[in-house]
Amino acid sequence: MTNQQGRLRTRVAVFACVAAAALIVDQLTKAWAMAALSNGQTIRVIPGLLSFTLVRNPGASLGMGSGATWVISLLAVVACVALAVAGVRTVSMKWSVAISFAFAGALGNLIDRVMYADGFLDGKVVDFLNYGWSVGNVADIYLVVAGVVLVILILMGEPFSHKDLIEQSDESLQSEPEADAK
């Protein structure tokens, strides 16, 4: 096994382990919410800021798209496939971890849409974290955090692919003669 293959295996293993652990936490919290809050009960955690309230959301974030559940489900399938491919293709452990959280969030909500479906791709997501202005779940938190981290990685210029590494290497080699000339 080459060093490159070993690093790929490590990144894939980290991607799989982080995604699996995050997905398990998401699904366990949703199972708890359905068991503890199914009778319409609300549990106040931080008054005025956070409470637990069970909601079955057919739409996307903030309830948008509730009339197009099948479109949202189809987009979630495409997103999961794209994120899995990206998680395997990246050369950066930072990208791999961030993408694994996005994958876990997308897959966690897709699992809900399949498990709690009224028809083909017509399911609802289990939301229970009531912030007062929105109700979400742990998968939503993963998606938001992953999105923020991905933007930070882009802004920091963290290489995603071998091509990015080569371009960064070429740029640093080109700037070295300029530094030597000064």
Swiss-Prot record:
This is Lipoprotein signal peptidase. Its EC number is 3.4.23.36. It catalyses: Release of signal peptides from bacterial membrane prolipoproteins. Hydrolyzes -Xaa-Yaa-Zaa-|-(S,diacylglyceryl)Cys-, in which Xaa is hydrophobic (preferably Leu), and Yaa (Ala or Ser) and Zaa (Gly or Ala) have small, neutral side chains. It is a multi-pass membrane protein. It is found in: Cell membrane. The keyword Zinc does not apply. PANTHER family: LIPOPROTEIN SIGNAL PEPTIDASE (PTHR33695:SF1). GO terms for molecular function: aspartic-type endopeptidase activity. InterPro entries: Peptidase_A8. GO terms for cellular component: plasma membrane.
